[in-house]
Amino acid sequence: MAAPTREPDTREVKVPAGAVKQLALRFGFGAGCACVLWMVGLQRTGSNGFGPKQILAQLLVPLAVVASQWLLRKAAKPNKPGLGASLGVGVFTALLAASISAVGTVGLAYGAGEPAVAQHRAEVLEIVKAQQRENPKAVASSAVQQQVAQVQHMTVGNMATSNFLQVLVLGLVLAVPVGIFLRE
């Protein structure tokens, strides 16, 4: 008895025109604006808008990436979106959300003024010192001094770059595996 042969999948890899761009713009813009609104809300309520609490809004970015990839797959049915389109919509969504969030960080820093940025520096410095107190043997004295100096000289550009990278990495963490999974 011969082993059954499997027919190759002959469905076309086809995505509706402009679907990748449209979905990425919609979800990337929405997630980026949600990050900015969250930071502004934190700042307006007396919390540090640049601090660790902003991660709560940044967690929306991976969800937006997955939603854009899911809707792309749905829009392409009965065809497949393909690997390029599926990864492309996810990466573009994450890039757009990260860019909007970083620009929002700069805008908030200039809008809130130097006292808010100085407060953020002081909070980060306290976190760094607390980490060093917890494990004094792990870090050399010169590395400690260098880290403290970097925190003391933190600029708005450094904060925006950090925000951009955090949001981008969070988005890409799910964009790649989900894009591969949803391509077919």
Residue ranges and their predicted role:
Residues 2-75:
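Transmembrane alpha-helical insertion/packing segments
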Residues 34-38, 42, 61-65, 97-101, ...:
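Alpha-helical transmembrane segments of multipass membrane proteins
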Residues 74, 182-184:
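Membrane-interface capping segments at transmembrane-helix boundaries
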Residues 103-134:
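Functional transmembrane-helix hotspots
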Residues 128-155:
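Short membrane-interface loop/juxtamembrane segments of multi-pass integral membrane proteins
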